Amino acid sequence: MKFGVGFLLSCLVALNTVQNMLALSCLPCDFDTLKCSPLPDDDDCFPAYTPCGCCPQCAGEEDDFCDNFTVRCHPDLVCVNATGFEKKFVYWYEFDFKGTCQESELETEYEYEYEENETKK
């Protein structure tokens, strides 16, 4: 009887772990049926993606809200939170970082690097 309870408990823990991993995963993009809206044809629109986004959007402009699930800020801007901390990228696992797109107050110039999901599009 003890073996059965231990086995059942182990199965429940494994199932819970798998469900948590799937909840943090992005669904694959189906480009055969996907219909993306065209982006504006101007220099102000820098194509970027949300963490699980399949279609490009214009990157965040100055004073736009930014966090781990929004499209990244324009390459000339950084995401600044209420304490003044700057991030060029807010990664999907940084759940507590929320801010607005602003010009950097630091003297260091950021060099833009494509996110992993941006190079695959």
Swiss-Prot record:
The entry's localization annotation reads: Secreted
In which tissues or organs does this protein occur?
Component of the acid-insoluble organic matrix of calcified layers of the shell (at protein level).
- Cystines in this chain: 26-52, 29-54, 36-55, 45-58, 66-79, 73-101
Report the principal subcellular site: secreted
Gene3D superfamilies per record: 4.10.40.20
Query: Carries keyword Glycosyltransferase?
Result: no
Q: Which residues cross the membrane?
A: none
InterPro entries, A to Z: Growth_fac_rcpt_cys_sf, IGFBP-like, Insulin_GF-bd_Cys-rich_CS
Q: Span of the secretion signal? A: 1-23
- This one is known as Perlustrin-like protein
Which species is this record about?
Answer: Lottia gigantea (Giant owl limpet)
